[in-house]
Amino acid sequence: MFESLGEKLNNAFKKFRNKGKLTEADVKAGMREIKLALLEADVNFKVVRDFIKIVSERAVGSEVLESLLPAQQVVKIVNEELTRLMGGTQSKLNISPKPPTVIMMVGLQGAGKTTHAGKLAGMYKKQGKRPLLVACDVYRPAAIKQLQIVGEKLEIPVFTLGDKISPVEIAKEGIKHANQKGYDMVFIDTAGRLQIDEVLMQELQDIKAAVEPSEILLTVDSMIGQESVNVAETFNNLLDITGVILTKLDGDTRGGAALSIRYVTGKPIKFVGTGEKLDTIEPFHPDRMASRILGMGDVLTLIDKAQAAYDEKQAAELEQKMRQQTFTLDDYLAQLAQLKSMGNLEQLMSMMPGVKPGALKDAKIDESVLARTEAIIHSMTKKEREKPDIINASRKKRIAAGSGTSVEEVNKLLKQFDQMLKMMKQFSNMGKSRKGMKMLGRMKMPF
């Protein structure tokens, strides 16, 4: 995510190293590099111009802290200004005091509108809401079917009247249905187009007038860069959108859309899509995103993901097993399942502080390692999982054959598990600190 931009910004910061004090000439030279990095990231020209002006003024002004080194001063200022550029603080969804809360999803075809209607509904379902998806795209072949498939996977009902009724009537009937059945959130999936046209916009304006939504969320493909800003501006002028969902952010190395949309439209980015799976959606935090761009990590989002995957009852049982030194490969398997539920490994690693942008682009992070580890453990008997010491050479061959792996991989797993048991024993013997054991109980690293 934004690896290219982050790498170039960090290279620009090198201009300020080994400087005793920042001069106007130093700042000017560094700002030239930062400006180039932003323009190459397809950030809107006006945004770049104003951003550079503010950062330059602050870098040579009285706001600079004398306790920081010049490079640190500039990074601090750039971090604060990137945060401000993207909205400053998180903009939450506007929940109606009288249910249902109606969210109207709009956007061009191919931006991921239908999928993200489902993702958003799924996210709020996990928070205890009762969402309903309403299929108002009667034009695109299989659009209704696509929404129904998404709904089935998430176990969220989909309201549809087929493709012969007008989208305005479907939207109105969908709201009535939600009121009758007690759904407290309604996500209206409207029709997209390959390009903006008057017919599309008039239909969307008619739906807006008919259902008076609490939110009009525009889904925008972050991969199209500057064009996404133009799309957002057009939709905002005609519909007065309330927020933006930036999709495909996991594949965007530049970041032009994220840095430009709020500034140009005045409307906040509320959510970001970070993958193809239906749980890969996150609330947008400008401060966290700025830190991630600059390689400072995003520990808070990492904690959010860990808490979402965290099972308190399971953790308590695990802590007890660690204390009693009865931790088995079945327990190890449960920990792997929790790790997988947190999401893509590369994305998780990129949130760690100190991992510079671009540092992971050449790293070969093999996601199949977890799957192979699970296969090895599943190929063991219950007794072998409870007492891995009994696994001799012939058993290893059988396990390797059953899991489609090699004896070496089986040996590696057993060695790693043995090392983990030794570490647990050390923690247990160190005064049996409850805090220490609890921290270990929450440890989700696979190896």
PLM features: residue spans?
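Primarily NTPase-proximal linker/entry elements flanking Walker-type ATP/GTP-binding cores
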Residues: L9-C136, A143-D163, I170-T190
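Conserved phosphate-handling catalytic cores of large alpha/beta enzymes
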Residues: A171-I175, N179, Y183, Q195, ...
